[in-house]
């Protein structure tokens, strides 16, 4: 089976939660929960509130996201 296409969006980290989870406000105003992708975790990339991030959303659950890129 091929992987489903993901929806990429921009957002801003609002709050840090336990277990490397973050509350993210997307460009369209929705608030989602996001976790760090494996490559970012391996390279010890730190994410702080106020950082702009790129997230991947799956069409199955639009309330959870995977953080794939961080900009300042």
Swiss-Prot record:
Keywords: Cytoplasm, Initiation factor, Protein biosynthesis, RNA-binding, rRNA-binding. It is found in: Cytoplasm. GO terms for molecular function: ribosome binding; rRNA binding; translation initiation factor activity. The keyword Cytoplasm applies. One of its GO terms (cellular component) is cytosol. Residues 1-72 form the S1-like domain. It comes from the Bacteria. InterPro entries: NA-bd_OB-fold, RNA-binding_domain_S1_IF1, S1_domain, TIF_IF1. Belongs to the IF-1 family. Component of the 30S ribosomal translation pre-initiation complex which assembles on the 30S ribosome in the order IF-2 and IF-3, IF-1 and N-formylmethionyl-tRNA(fMet); mRNA recruitment can occur at any time during PIC assembly. One of the essential components for the initiation of protein synthesis. Stabilizes the binding of IF-2 and IF-3 on the 30S subunit to which N-formylmethionyl-tRNA(fMet) subsequently binds. Helps modulate mRNA selection, yielding the 30S pre-initiation complex (PIC). Upon addition of the 50S ribosomal subunit IF-1, IF-2 and IF-3 are released leaving the mature 70S translation initiation complex. This is Translation initiation factor IF-1. It comes from Nitrosomonas europaea (strain ATCC 19718 / CIP 103999 / KCTC 2705 / NBRC 14298).
């Amino acid at each position: 089976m091929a992987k489903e296409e993901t929806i990429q969006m921009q957002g801003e980290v609002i709050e840090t939660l336990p277990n490397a989870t973050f509350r993210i406000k997307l460009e369209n105003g929705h608030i989602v929960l996001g976790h760090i992708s494996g490559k970012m975790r391996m390279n010890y990339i730190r994410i702080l509130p106020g950082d702009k991030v790129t997230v991947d959303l799956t069409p199955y659950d639009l309330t959870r996201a995977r953080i794939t890129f961080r900009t300042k």
